[in-house]
Amino acid sequence: MEYGLIGEKLGHSFSKIIHEMIADYIYELKEIAKDDLDSFMKSKDFKCINVTIPYKKAVLPYLDFISEEAKKIGCVNTIINKDGKLYGYNTDYYGLKLLIEKQNVNLENKNVLVLGTGGTSLTAKAVLKDLGVSKIYQASRKSEDGLISYSDIYNYDINYIVNTTPVGMYPNNLDKLIEVSKFKNLLGLTDVIYNPLNTNLVLDGIELGIKADGGLYMLIAQAVYAIKLFKNIEIPNLKIDEVYNKLLKEKQNIVLIGMPSCGKSTIAKELEKRLNKAVYDSDTEVERIINTTISNFIKSNGETNFRNIESSVIENLSKQNSLIISTGGGVILRKENMFNLKQNGLIIFIDRPLELLTPTSSRPLTSNKFDLKKKYNERIDLYKKYADIIVKNDSNVDDTIEEIIRRLD
């Protein structure tokens, strides 16, 4: 291996895509078991590598040189082999600092809560100190001096939170350590996790109306700084934004919500051609599981059982990337569905006026005009609440598709 990333589990990593977007080398992902780290590091069979969980501190004894920022932090994420001598750096510092600065949240003299005690927590504390925070509280499940327990965190006046733990990371997307709504003076938060793009922690912050971001921007920024070191070249910071926007657009799911007969399925098929993303219809996936029509299933088993299966389908689809997901009309009735869809998705409400919607027997909950109107009135505010983009579909469907493409660009 010449260039690459080492870690224990790398199935979720975007690093190969990012490095190969920017640099002219092949970037490999190499999973290394803890028992094999010693032989790998002693062999020095690489040119330049990045290091991730759980080896950011474990590699320190193998290094011949450690940069000043890495010494201050106490861990590295970047190693360069120069004629058999190993040089260690910490580019996570620059990535996290740029992400927080991008939020325009003034942390000077503020109280910050850091979740976790691993290598990234050391980076976070170094960044926060340099941003002039007043006090850093560090939460852990361990009982040690200088740490506070998760049961005690709500007793402190916290203004900002940084999650450095893997809690909420794919495939355990639903996991969450804390309830941000319990902090009354919270200005913002950062979760270093980038898969999913928005963890439930981030979504909770967004719902509260505070600045809240996942770790994708940090990941790209630290990669740019690593590439500068790898190749001894200058790369403008504008490149970070360029790659971020491109990768976000590539990885993000497009999720269509709206009433039955609003045009979601037709629009999804056309978007598939334009966006080069695979289409999944949640109703079709449900019927694949129940082995009958949704109409028959609801008549025999009731709506609640149908909604439970639908939620399971939504959870599984939401964990994937680069999809177009056409949802059933009632998907917005459960907040958990919408939080799952928002983790990796951009929600587009296909807003078709009630008078243009068509009741059909294949949709048991909206099979006549009376029920259709009733459901429309029950759901319209929820569609608008969860939508990132609202697009009218009241004339030519081609115009609707063009409007979606325009809004995505």
Language-model features, listed with the residues they occupy:
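Phosphate/diphosphate ligand-binding glycine-rich loop within oxidoreductases
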Residues: E2-Q103, P196-N198, D204, L208-K211, ...
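Glycine-rich adenosine-cofactor-binding loop
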Residues: G7, N90-Y93, I100, N109-K129, ...
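NAD(P)-binding Rossmann-fold cofactor-contacting core
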Residues: L131-L147, E285-I290
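Rossmann-like adenosine-cofactor binding region
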Residues: G146-A212, V331-N337
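Adenosine-phosphate binding glycine-rich loop
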Residues: V192-Q252, N393
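NTP-dependent small-molecule kinase module
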Residues: D241-K249, E270, R274, L346, ...
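ATP-dependent small-molecule kinase phosphotransfer cores
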Residues: T284-F339
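A glycine- and Lys/Arg-enriched "phosphate-lid" helix/loop adjacent to the NTP-binding pocket
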Residues: N344-L382
